[in-house]
């Protein structure tokens, strides 16, 4: 390496013979200066450039790893959210089906209750009609009996004397009282 450096120094002492030679002015441009500057840059800059590229590579790899981790986390969260969504949809379907079946059950219960109420009302109506018929029949019987008694009394009055008349009336009143007790019971 010393020989190379010495040779470059020797070049610097050569008298300039025109346009070719070693120029000590770093800003001057000629092929030798350019090759020396490039050689120095490559020799010393290779480590710095390598370190910069390695640092950049590490940052990129870290960013990629972080992105992969975030992506995996996002995929995991998405899967969890999809599982929760499926669960909620299943529960919603179950509630919907149960709700419809509950509505149908309530509807059937209401219809059955209405039929039961209608049957009870029909029974009450029939009982009321039967009771009213019995009452009317009893009233008709009483009127018929009263008219028959009045007719019999009229016939008896015309045919019987006072004593016989009183006995017949007493017997009829007793019989009428017995019938009246049976009717009112």
From Swiss-Prot:
GO terms for cellular component: chloroplast thylakoid membrane; proton-transporting ATP synthase complex. It is a single-pass membrane protein. Its main location: plastid. GO terms for molecular function: ATP binding; proton-transporting ATP synthase activity, rotational mechanism. It holds the Pfam family ATP-synt_B. It comes from the Eukaryota. The chain crosses the membrane at residues 27-49. The keyword Ion transport applies. In plastids the F-type ATPase is also known as CF(1)CF(0). Belongs to the ATPase B chain family. F-type ATPases have 2 components, F(1) - the catalytic core - and F(0) - the membrane proton channel. F(1) has five subunits: alpha(3), beta(3), gamma(1), delta(1), epsilon(1). F(0) has four main subunits: a(1), b(1), b'(1) and c(10-14). The alpha and beta chains form an alternating ring which encloses part of the gamma chain. F(1) is attached to F(0) by a central stalk formed by the gamma and epsilon chains, while a peripheral stalk is formed by the delta, b and b' chains. This is ATP synthase subunit b, chloroplastic. It comes from Glycine max (Soybean).
């Amino acid at each position: 390496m010393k020989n190379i450096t010495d040779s470059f120094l020797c070049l610097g002492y050569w008298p300039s013979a025109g346009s070719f030679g070693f120029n000590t002015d770093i800003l001057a441009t000629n092929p030798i200066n350019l090759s020396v500057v490039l050689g120095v840059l490559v020799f010393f800059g290779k480590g710095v450039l390598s370190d910069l590229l390695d640092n950049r590579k590490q940052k990129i790899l870290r960013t990629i790893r972080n992105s992969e981790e975030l992506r995996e986390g996002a995929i995991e969260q998405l899967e969890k959210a999809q599982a929760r969504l499926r669960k909620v949809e299943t529960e919603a379907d179950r509630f919907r089906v149960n709700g419809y079946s509950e509505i149908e059950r309530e509807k059937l219960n209401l219809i059955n209750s209405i039929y039961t109420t209608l049957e009870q009302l029909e029974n009450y109506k029939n009982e009321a009609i039967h009771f009213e018929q019995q009452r009317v029949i009893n009233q008709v019987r009483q009127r018929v009996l009263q008219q028959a008694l009045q007719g019999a009394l009229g016939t008896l009055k015309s045919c019987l004397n006072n004593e016989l008349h009183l006995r017949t009336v007493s017997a009829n009143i007793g019989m009428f009282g017995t019938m009246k007790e049976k009717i009112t019971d």
